[in-house]
């Protein structure tokens, strides 16, 4: 199996970072820079990343189909957390249609059947609007349907676009670069906020986020992702400074908005985390909320200027 140089570099970087992190924690502890609470939190998060990192990286490295299936599983699990937090799971038929829509989106991506992939958005929304009538309960109809449509768009359509990248010959390094950059975008925002953050970005929605943190993340993530895209998209129409900067800006902005949207939902529900699956992080949706809008935004930008999977076989399963 041939691996793109960007893939090799990113995987190596992840392994090194996980290996060096304990030494960094020990050094900070010895210097008295860590409180007992912060020290315990850092070690908890590090242990969680020892499990999360392979779960994220291995499907992307194994190839096209494992990557798409992996994203589909993530979408279903995130939807499950959302449904339980919002109470949508109590409406069994609507919840089942949303789950089926996510599975069909995943199948369309795996089949590289783009017309079906696009059609599923309107088809699933239409089915949700109609199927909710069978409960014969007008009270709460708008809320039930809106939650179902919202959930499908977030976890079916948005994650589906990210998974569809795997159909491109550069899908592997591209998806891995997106994952690494979006996770570091959160780190950059946190560090920049500590250094330069004075004015709150959205105090009612996310009290810890600052304008300085958001701008710092924007600059640093744009530089990082633009550099990664230079090596990933070399020889394509997108390997130009204007496009590389635009890709970085899009990723950082959409990543931060994904986080803010989920924070707003949690504030509305009166909860801190969507779940407690991952120690130190909350649930899967708490960890991957920044990914929500990145997929569609980058997919259509890259698709417009370069195309996605145009040189790869389409309708792999249904076209036989």
Give each language-model segment a name:
Residues 1-250:
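Membrane-embedded alpha-helical bundles of polytopic integral membrane proteins
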Residues 189-190, 209-221, 251, 255-258, ...:
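Alpha-helical transmembrane segments that form the membrane-embedded catalytic/substrate-binding core
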Residues 20, 268-320:
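C-terminal membrane module of polytopic membrane proteins
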Residues 237-257, 269-270, 276-280:
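Short amphipathic alpha-helical interaction segments
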Residues 84-88, 144-148, 197, 263-270, ...:
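Short amphipathic alpha-helical coupling elements at transmembrane boundaries
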């Amino acid at each position: 199996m041939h691996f793109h140089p960007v893939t090799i570099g990113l995987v190596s970087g992840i392994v090194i970072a996980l290996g060096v992190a304990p030494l960094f924690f020990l050094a900070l502890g010895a210097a008295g820079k860590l409180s007992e609470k912060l020290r315990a939190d850092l070690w908890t998060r590090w242990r969680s990343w020892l499990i999360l990192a392979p779960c994220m990286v291995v499907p992307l490295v194994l190839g096209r189909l494992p990557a798409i299936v992996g994203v589909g599983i993530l979408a279903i699990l995130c939807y499950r957390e959302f449904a339980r937090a919002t109470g949508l799971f109590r409406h069994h038929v609507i919840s089942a249609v949303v789950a089926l829509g996510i599975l069909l989106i995943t199948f369309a991506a795996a089949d590289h059947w783009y017309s079906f992939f696009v059609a599923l958005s309107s088809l699933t929304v239409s089915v949700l609007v109609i199927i909710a009538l069978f409960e014969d309960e007008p009270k709460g109809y708008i809320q039930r349907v809106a939650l179902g449509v919202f959930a499908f768009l977030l976890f079916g359509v948005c994650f589906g676009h990210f998974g569809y990248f795997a159909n491109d010959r550069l899908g592997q390094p591209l998806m891995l670069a997106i994952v690494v950059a979006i996770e570091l975008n959160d780190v950059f925002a946190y560090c920049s906020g500590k250094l330069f953050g004075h004015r709150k970005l959205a105090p009612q929605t996310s009290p810890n986020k600052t304008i300085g943190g958001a701008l710092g993340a924007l600059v640093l993530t744009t530089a990082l992702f633009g550099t990664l895209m230079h090596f990933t998209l070399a020889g394509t129409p997108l390997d130009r400074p204007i496009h590389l900067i635009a890709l970085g800006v899009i990723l950082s902005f959409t990543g931060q908005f994904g986080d803010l949207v989920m924070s707003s939902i949690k504030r509305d529900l009166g909860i801190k985390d969507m779940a407690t699956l991952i120690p130190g992080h909350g649930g899967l949706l708490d960890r991957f909320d920044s990914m929500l809008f990145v997929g569609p935004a980058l997919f259509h930008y890259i698709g417009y200027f370069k195309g996605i999977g145009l040189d790869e076989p389409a309708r792999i399963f249904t076209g036989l």
